[in-house]
Amino acid sequence: MRTLTSKWTKTLVLLKSNKVRRYIPETRLFNKSSVLSLLKKYQMVYVKPVNGSFGQGVIRVDLQRTKSGSKYRYQHGTASRSFGNYDAMYSSISKSKLKRSYLVQKGIHMLKYNNRVFDIRIMVQKNRERKWEASGYIGRVAHPKKIVTNFHNSGKPLPLETLLERFVQGEQKQAYIRDLKNLGYQIAVHLNKHYPGFREIGVDIGIDKELKPWIFEVNTAPDPLIFNQLKDKRMFRKVIHYARLNGRFRKK
């Protein structure tokens, strides 16, 4: 089954879609000028490996303007460092990324659940008719001391309905979830036009305080087992069924 690991390649492809483009945070290749430019524009950015998974290597960078000047801070895992000037901070980040290729992306101030940020995984798979279907959705809450939500990085999976309850209710909530599923579907269709052969994708989406969804990443080898963390197993059974149809978990 085909996969595509480069976040930069996937970003460039998605930017070609009129339906998807407006949900992609501004993203550039990592260098000294691009990080500073986006920091000045947004005050908060994320630096992430071009090739990577499970939230490993993701760094949050903040710019705080004060009367005495600018202060810079970054967090990597549970550790954070502060600097009085940009050059020192950039040098430190450059050393920590171990010469790998990185991206810098506009930071999104995401919604929180119990004072912890969360994002959403939309699972989109080819079904029995070989048509794309948004087969599953789940929320992922970050560890209190971490900036990433991945289950493999101490994140906690929860029903999306639970996480959205404070912000949208009733039929409006169901309509909102349908819109998220449709966004995942549109991404799968568009990506498959440029790179035929995909059978599954996992779309990671963050929601800002105006309830706008932002596409953080499209994973072309998504882990279906996260859905087993939900008490209601119906979604998990569907996701696993489609995964097997698509060639996952074959017996050796």
Where are these regions (language model features)?
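Glycine-rich phosphate-binding loop of ATP-grasp-fold ATP-dependent ligases
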Residues: 24-26, 45-89
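C-terminal active-site "lid" helix and adjoining low-complexity regulatory extension at the edge
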Residues: 1-8, 12, 168-171, 175-178, ...
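Short beta-strand micro-motifs enriched in acidic
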Residues: 64, 123-127, 206-210
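A short catalytic or substrate-binding loop motif that flags glycine-/basic-rich loops and adjacent residues
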Residues: 39, 51-53, 113-117, 197
